[in-house]
Amino acid sequence: MNKKIKLFDPVIDHLEEEKILEVLRSGNWASGAGKGNVKKFEENFQKYTNSDDCIAVNSGTAALNLALSLLNIKNKHVILPSMSFVSTANAVVMNGGIPVFVEIEPETMCIDPESVKKLLTKKTSVILPVHFGGMPCKLDKLNQIIKGFKCTIIEDAAHAAGTSYKKKKIGSHSFASCFSFHPVKNLAMPTGGAITINNKQHTKIRKELESKRWCGITDRKLSEYNVKDIGNNYYMNEFSAAIGLIQLKKLDRMNKQRREIAKIYCKEIDLENKMQFDQNCSYHLFWIRVKNRNKFRKILDKKKIETGTHYKAIHTFDFYQKFNKAPMTKKISEEIVTIPIHPNLKSHEIDKIVSVINSTN
């Protein structure tokens, strides 16, 4: 019986298994202080991204919430794409900001700088671009557009571990970049996230984030501590960090494999609307667009090929309908299909995916 071709599949071997056993037997499974494997992961990821600093947290959502908490965005506008996981917008609202949805570039699914220019005002506090599917946004253009505005770029890099832009890793460009680590992500963990910081005051910012990720705890000496501001239980556990350390060593190799698959898809899938090839992209996702999506997905499901719909446009959810619309994004979100792209795919599975899509189209 043929197995289903998975949409996502983490790449693990004996190294992750051995590391998990090591943590399990140590008895040191988690620490709000962020020592042990968590500290090592922060140091290694900071070096990998060539950022000024790195703070590990327990999800990409936590990373976004904490990064935005560094700025006073209450009642201020945050410009972001509607094409993203809902956490991107949730983090804005949870910090008191007002989400302003802009259109995306159909060829990249990333935020459209020209749309940003049209909606940028004195009320705008943050631009929140999403490196969709691992495709780098046009950060240079965004930085040019916000000149003269009191505006900060915080990157949603949930898809972009290992992505580069202008020969520099994502995580090294802006004030803050927010990463997500999960079994479906390029750098897999049970759950995890990170914030990279680039700022002259990064040491001070780090201390603030360390406190906020541990319920506001600060000035800790033995069992004594203080709380000067509220925080959340956002710290990363030792198991996630241990797996992350192994995954980070493999990341560039795994991303190279993803790019090789993407190159095949770009060349052989006979569809006009599909993800483009970019040597800088980490290809967390590979998307295509089809007219009759439900019918298309059912055919692929019968052929035992998993697909996804990343994502439903955020502004169409009930809660977000009170904010502005992005009609082109809505149309695209109703046509988008994500197909398997991960290093565990075999050559015959890649061939099957291409063949079934071409015969179904």
Please provide the spans of the model-predicted regions.
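Active-site region of PLP-dependent enzymes
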Residues: 160-166, 173-285, 315-318
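N-terminal "arm"/small-domain region of PLP-dependent enzymes with the aminotransferase-like
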Residues: 1-30
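Phosphate-binding glycine-rich loop
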Residues: 31-77, 83, 91-95, 101-103, ...
